[in-house]
Amino acid sequence: YALEKDIQKMREIREDERLGPSTGSIVEEAVSRGIPWIRLNKYSLVQLGYGANQKRIQATVTSETSSIGVEIACDKEDTKYLLEQAEVEVPRGDIIRKERSLEEACNYVGFPLVIKPVDGNHGRGITVDINSLKEALVAFAHAKESSRSGVIIVEKFITGDDYRLLVINNQLVAAAIRTPAHVVGNGKSTIQELIDEVNSDPRRGYGHEKVLTQITTNELTKTLIKDAGYTLDSVLPEDERLILKDTANLSTGGTAEDVTDIVHPANVSMAERISKIIDLDICGIDIMTSDITKPLSDTGGAVLEVNAGPGFRMHLAPTTGLPRNVAAPVIDKLFPKGKNGRIPIIAITGTNGKTTTTRLLAHIAKMNGHRVGYTTSDGVYIQNRLLMTGDCTGPSSAEFVLKDPTVNFAVLESARGGLLRAGLGFEKCDVAIVTNVAADHLGLKGIHTIEQ
């Protein structure tokens, strides 16, 4: 019996169901401040706070994020143009749509090249350090596969180290140097054995389950190994470093080192200015430079990309260096000091009289100027308008009210059945009322006495 296959399947289910590291970190920070949350879909769309006081996040895009800023960042051509116009260092490049234009673009830009889709993200479709037209043709086809628009960028390959600068609320909060997945030879082990050894690091796991991701040997990896003159069964010479992925993303097995405290002030100022140029409250700026402690203009480095919805993982848990709580400034912006996103909640339970009590309290709240949502055994009401009929005294009905952005006061009938079946739709309330406890429902769910 292959137990490991079942364990791996469970890992995959967990990765599919749980919040990603970036979303999860923001939710954890919210919870630490007493801010309630509701997951709105099976992915990364989350509501923080209740009713009229709610904010939303989807990974690291928030309800405060500029839509036009996201559109600009997702279009590398627009991003590069705006940065170029603002005298920000960017690589020389060209935009093409057809393969027949590739040779001319290569001659214009000059080798070595980077080829990538104009609308790509997370490193998809990117090929770097291209040194011939033959390589460029393969890279062009790869970029096309990852592009929705079919528009491809051909730009100069800038040498140096890959840095990610994270700017939140127009302030640099973290910086990391990223290294692509790689192995270093010892003169004895095959490349596959070296990969297995790297993957045995307890910090590496499947997907986002740990701070690092295991290195997989896909077709791209095999191509890079072949281009270096090896196969997976080759013994790598001692101290030789073999790159296994085109990009330095942690999700493909890369590593990250925190360098926040050594970024040159000119580069800090540039990153913060870029966030305003692109108009993003949260952005990840990718820079290639030989030395982040010097201004970009002194090293010949360049800004490669500006990313909306950047990943936080490399900053929350870098491979080396100081972890940064980059979720904190996100919550600072969404919920200024003293705000917790809550609305008043009155919850009513008991054997008899719950609905009458709920209606009475909702009426009193409405007469005092509140926009009331309430649940009863005959339906859900928002400002006395019936929106859902039937017995609506369970947790899903409570969530219905707490999700409504027009509600600033909730009165929730919470019947015994829903409590036993699925609990409450909220983790705490301001006022809890038990009308009475009678013998009406004895004998159900293992309850046989009033004392029970």
Place the predicted regions along the sequence by residue.
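Short, high-confidence coil segments that cap the C-terminus of an alpha-helix
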Residues: G110, S149, L280, T406-V407
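ATP-dependent carboxylate activation and anion-phosphoryl transfer catalytic cores
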Residues: Y1-S32, Q171-E193, K245-T349
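Hydrophobic residues within alpha-helices
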Residues: I26, T79, T357-L361
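Active-site nucleotide/adenylate-binding loops and adjacent lid/helix of ATP-dependent enzymes
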Residues: R56-N218, P265
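Structured, non-catalytic alpha/beta "coupling" segments that mediate domain-domain communication
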Residues: S25-L45
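Phosphate-binding loop of NTP-binding sites
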Residues: F335-Q452
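Hydrophobic anchor at the start of a short beta-strand
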Residues: W37, V90, L113, I152, ...
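Extended, charge-rich helix/loop segments that form flexible
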Residues: L194-T255
